[in-house]
UniProtKB/Swiss-Prot annotation:
One of its GO terms (cellular component) is cytoplasm. The gene is uhpA. This is Transcriptional regulatory protein UhpA. Phosphorylated and dephosphorylated by UhpB. PROSITE patterns: HTH_LUXR_1, HTH_LUXR_2, RESPONSE_REGULATORY. PANTHER family: TRANSCRIPTIONAL REGULATORY PROTEIN UHPA, TWO-COMPONENT RESPONSE REGULATOR. GO terms for molecular function: DNA binding. NCBIfam families: PRK10360.1.
């Protein structure tokens, strides 16, 4: 029997996953948590083999939580975003699998079985994005905008310097945040200085 814990701040997501996993004869959901803090308090001693964790939670992000979970637990990260940079961040932080919240039930079940037996799991579409993203996830213009944002320039200043409209710079900024898996300009600057 593979024991599973679910960590997601949305009750309906946890309930749906618990019902789905409960249909499998060799899977048992033994714990559900609505926040990272609840999980840190409740996971030790539960004998959980696989943890399915939302990446975006209000108190502690799934990425931050990965380093604090009990050792020996295989973790699958869930996200509505599946940019190559975000997938890499999750894998580098210790995740054994990464699934989009749009994944099929079969993919979720396959991921649990795979990580429980020591493997790593990515859906084929995420694996393709990850491989393509390793080449260079940013366009030339996105890289220019990223450099200016990292220098602390305002959107209007960047637009004037690059001969773009402020709206276009905002679009490039939004694309950068998604591609790099960051949520603001400060995190973007850190990623720039870390070499992506």
């Amino acid at each position: 029997m593979i024991t599973v814990a679910l960590i997601d701040d949305h009750l309906i997501v946890r309930s749906g996953f618990a019902q789905l996993l409960g249909l499998e004869p060799d899977l048992q959901v033994v714990a559900e948590f609505g926040s990272g803090r609840e999980a840190l308090a409740g996971l030790p001693g539960r004998g959980v083999q696989v943890c399915i964790c939302d990446i975006s939670m209000p108190d502690i992000s799934g990425l931050e939580l990965l380093s604090q979970l009990p050792k020996g637990m295989a973790t699958i990260v869930l996200s509505v975003h599946d940019s190559p940079a975000l997938v890499e961040q999750a894998l580098n932080a210790g995740a054994r699998g990464f699934l989009s919240k749009r994944c099929s039930p079969d993919e979720l079940i396959a991921a649990v079985h795979t990580v429980a037996t020591g493997g790593c799991y990515l859906t084929p579409d995420i694996a393709v994005k990850l491989a393509a993203g390793r080449q260079d996830p940013l366009t030339k213009r996105e890289r220019q905008v990223a450099e200016k944002l990292a220098q602390g320039m305002a959107v209007k200043e960047i637009a004037a310097e690059l001969g773009l409209s402020p709206k276009t710079v905002h679009v490039h900024r939004a694309n950068l945040l998604e591609k790099l898996g960051v949520s603001n300009d400060v995190e973007l600057a850190h990623r720039m200085f870390d070499g992506w």
